């Protein structure tokens, strides 16, 4: 029958998928780094599903253990659960930030609600929490050292903050809220990324006045990449946007670029995020109140060094007054220059970078464009390596390993005695599937399995000015 043929084909496809999914096998790569040359978007959802099933079994084993709850059979067992889920999640989240595509976005929309529900199933489980609480209540009499005691307190606090003390009706509402909150960042981030990628400012040769040769070169290569001949293109990515705002003499074009950046996902945009922001605020506030906090800010800061929103505002206010006074002084200096160029004009946000650079040149004889050749990315990276070696004795050796994008470079990190410390990925340049900003993350966290140290695999991700055919990547003092 046709249904039998379908079942046989489906079964074959599933077996093939299992056989080909890199997350279902040990990674035979240098130091066990992710096999990016084999990982594909369709691998993640099955990997998440298997990883969640494995952790569910690990949690069930803790719950069904008939021995008296102890640090080893409850706290340590819980802490060691979910390693596969962590591994898949670290790789997935990194790729969704640094090299996303439509297939990954679709996988993320499917995975996030499943992961949120899985997390709630664990953190709101009464049997598991009762065992954790039993150890927590007896922590002072179990002969634990300071590290073990801290782990008990952290895990107990994590469950309480997640809603373990709520009644069944409250827990059900919390699950609904968490499910909705799981999808909102995905939708919000996708909109920002698409709005950023959709905008291009096309320039003619008459609109290049003031732009250094390196900035023109990047704009020219971007235009060629987009198939635009005899043109120059500026995008909303920081390495393209900020140099244009800094050097372009075309005030109307600076305004156009600045407003395009600020108005992303705003009213009238195809990717309007305003309703999502309202949903964020409403759901977070309801969650905080459900958990016994007066606001979401109070909920977040309660687990941080600040402790309360009031402490955060106290610090901000200490900085705000002198910072505002200094900003007004700088604006007055820049406005004086603006009046020379455009008498009667009002100083606008898109004037800030341009006139700040003019003030630096006029007052301090500092010119970023002149200084940049001294800060090629290669020189800065080698300088950082040299400093790390002088301070800590560690060295960095190029490593041939799979990468998720051709722009990435990989290094093995060695201790002073030559032993392996970890692997470091660099991903320096902007591209259409990459979030803005800079961050450090891990593909594998450092941990210990018994006495064996599992070395970390770390990535440093930036959005520096990319090289052109004629010039290397040049950084600024900032």
What kind of feature is each model-predicted range?
Residues 151, 183, 190, 194-235, ...:
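Active-site-proximal, well-structured secondary-structure segments within enzyme catalytic domains
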Residues 17-212, 217-219:
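N-terminal helix-rich structural modules
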Residues 1-6:
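Short, small-residue-biased leader/transition segments that mark boundaries at the very start
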Residues 28-43, 92-111, 134-176, 235-275, ...:
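Short His/Asp/Glu-rich catalytic/ion-coordination signatures at enzyme active sites or charged loops
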Residues 465-478:
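Short pre-active-site segment immediately N-terminal to the catalytic Zn-binding motif
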């Amino acid at each position: 029958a046709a249904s039998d043929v379908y079942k046989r084909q489906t079964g074959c496809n599933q077996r093939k998928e299992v056989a080909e999914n890199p997350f279902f096998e040990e990674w035979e790569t240098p130091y066990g780094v992710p096999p990016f040359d084999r990982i594909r978007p369709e691998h993640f959802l099955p990997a998440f599903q298997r990883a969640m099933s494995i952790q569910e079994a690990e949690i069930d084993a803790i719950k069904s253990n008939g021995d008296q709850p102890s640090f080893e059979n409850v706290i340590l067992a819980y802490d060691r659960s979910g390693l596969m889920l962590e591994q898949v999640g670290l790789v997935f989240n990194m790729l969704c930030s640094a090299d996303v595509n439509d297939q990954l976005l679709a996988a993320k929309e499917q995975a996030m609600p499943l992961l949120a529900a899985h997390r709630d199933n664990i953190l709101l489980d009464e049997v598991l929490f009762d065992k954790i609480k039993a150890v927590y209540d007896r922590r002072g009499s179990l002969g634990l050292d300071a590290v073990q005691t801290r782990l008990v307190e952290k895990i107990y606090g994590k469950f309480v903050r997640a809603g373990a003390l709520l009644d069944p009706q409250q827990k059900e509402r919390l699950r609904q809220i968490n499910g909705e909150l799981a999808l909102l960042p995905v939708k919000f981030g996708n909109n920002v990324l698409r709005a950023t990628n959709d905008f291009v400012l096309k320039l003619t040769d008459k609109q290049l006045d003031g732009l250094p040769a390196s900035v023109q070169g990047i704009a020219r290569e971007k235009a060629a990449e987009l198939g635009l001949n005899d043109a120059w293109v500026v995008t909303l990515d920081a390495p393209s946007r900020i140099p244009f705002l800094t050097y372009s003499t075309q005030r109307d074009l600076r305004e156009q670029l600045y407003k395009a950046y600020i108005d992303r996902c705003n009213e009238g945009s195809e990717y309007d995020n305003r309703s999502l922001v309202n949903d964020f605020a409403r759901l977070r506030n309801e969650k905080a109140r459900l958990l016994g906090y007066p606001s979401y800010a109070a909920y977040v800061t309660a687990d941080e060094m600040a402790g309360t929103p009031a402490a955060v505002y106290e610090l901000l206010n200490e900085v705000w007054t002198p910072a505002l006074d200094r900003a007004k002084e700088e604006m007055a200096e820049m406005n004086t220059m603006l009046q020379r160029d455009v008498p009667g004009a009002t100083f606008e946000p898109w004037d800030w970078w341009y006139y700040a650079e003019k003030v630096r040149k006029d007052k301090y004889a500092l010119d970023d464009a002149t200084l940049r050749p001294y800060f090629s990315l290669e020189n800065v990276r080698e300088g950082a390596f040299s400093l790390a070696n002088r301070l800590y004795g560690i060295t960095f050796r190029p490593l041939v390993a799979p990468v998720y994008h051709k722009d990435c470079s990989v290094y093995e990190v060695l201790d002073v005695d030559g032993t392996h410390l970890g692997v470091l990925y660099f991903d320096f340049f902007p591209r259409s599937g990459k979030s803005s900003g800079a961050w450090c993350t891990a593909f594998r966290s450092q941990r210990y399995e018994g006495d064996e140290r599992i070395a970390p695999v770390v990535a440093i991700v930036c959005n520096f000015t990319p090289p052109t055919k004629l010039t290397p990547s040049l950084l600024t003092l900032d």
